[in-house]
From Swiss-Prot:
Repressor found in the keyword field: no
UniProt binding sites for Fe cation 1: 74, 105, 108
The keyword Magnesium is annotated on this UniProt entry: no
Name this polypeptide is given: Ribonucleoside-diphosphate reductase small chain
Species this chain originates from: Yaba-like disease virus (YLDV)
PANTHER family, alphabetized: RIBONUCLEOSIDE-DIPHOSPHATE REDUCTASE SMALL CHAIN, RIBONUCLEOSIDE-DIPHOSPHATE REDUCTASE SUBUNIT M2
PROSITE patterns from the UniProt entry: RIBORED_SMALL
């Protein structure tokens, strides 16, 4: 790809300094990410193990597979950011975001690893789950799909941007919904709270990919975008309805397929394409916690995790003595 055709990819020495801000929308996303910073120490897991013991074997098996996939997937996302996106994109606003995203993906991976470490007592089983990419075919399939985009030498930045929007917006969506389903039962407060925080973060990451896509002067054709999304949808459907079917936790597999299609349609719209599936959201409990990363988790903030003053303007922080008493 001729990077000189894309301003955000064109080499410039300006990438080494942050100011002046040129891309306000991209900078705003970076500040949102910073405002949402959290650490694993802020998640209370003290009540989770007693709930874990109450789950059926099917429910435990489902959660194990989900956590195993998540524990590995954040590392794959980071590999793409470190090896490809951060070095390719030349504007400092986006590089700030990607740098911070790498830190957050590390926290996500630590969180999932800690959850596995908390629930699974047998060391051999822990090791099996920590190495899910090698040990579980269903996880390996999703990992290999993402890795092929990292390693691709002939696909454009725009195409790979769509692929990783699909990873964070589609590959994660069904699993997030399944954990929110568990929350409805009032179980596993640590798991479900961390799921709120991580799904909010990933929603922002997916939104950011869509914003970067809109800054491309020569984006991939709609047909190419659609094919990438459809491929991701089919892999995710297989993951949650065949490999580790959500019926294990009492969810309807057909409705899960519909939900994945609904999420995919929304992503297609954000990427400037028409809907492909025209599916409605079958899960009312996901209406306010869907992967939009906009008002649901940032302005409304269910978890109320936003660092003080990060999103304020300089004029909001002026000290004054002219107040009437």
């Amino acid at each position: 790809m001729n990077t000189s055709c894309e301003p955000i990819l064109k080499p410039t020495l300006n990438k080494y300094v942050v100011f002046p801000i040129v891309y306000e929308d991209i900078w705003k996303m970076y500040k949102k990410a910073v405002a949402s910073f959290w650490t694993v120490e802020e998640v209370d897991l003290s009540k989770d193990f007693s709930d874990w013991l109450k789950l059926s074997d099917n429910e435990k098996n489902f959660i194990k597979h989900i956590l195993a996939f998540f524990a590995a997937s954040d590392g794959i996302v980071n590999e793409n950011l470190a090896e490809r996106f951060y070095s390719e994109v030349q504007i400092s606003e986006a590089r700030c975001f990607y740098g911070f995203q790498i830190a957050m993906e590390n926290i996500h991976s630590e969180m999932y690893s800690l959850l596995i470490d908390t629930y699974i007592l047998d060391s051999k089983e822990k090791n099996y789950l920590f190495n899910a990419i090698e040990n579980m075919n269903c996880v390996k399939q999703k990992a290999n799909w993402a890795k092929k985009w990292i390693e691709s030498k002939n696909r454009t930045y725009g195409e790979r941007l769509v692929a990783f929007a699909a990873v964070e917006g589609i590959f994660f969506s069904g699993s997030f919904a399944a954990i929110f389903w568990i929350k409805k039962r009032g179980l596993m407060p640590g798991l479900t709270f961390s799921n709120e925080l991580i799904s909010r973060d990933e929603g922002l990451h997916c939104d950011f990919a869509c914003i970067m896509f809109k800054h491309l002067l020569n984006p991939p054709l709609n047909s190419v975008v659609r094919d990438i999304i459809i491929e991701a949808v089919n892999i995710e459907k297989n993951f949650l309805t065949e490999a580790i079917p959500v019926k294990l936790i009492g969810m309807n597999c057909d409705l899960m397929k519909q939900y994945i299609e609904f999420v995919a349609d929304r992503l297609l719209l954000e990427l400037g394409c028409d809907k492909y599936y025209c599916s409605k959201n079958p899960f009312d409990f996901m209406e306010n916690i869907s992967l939009e990363g906009k008002t649901n988790f940032f302005e409304k903030r269910v978890s109320e995790y936003q660092k003080m003053s990060v999103m304020s303007n300089k004029k909001d922080n002026v000290f004054s003595l002219d107040i009437d008493f």
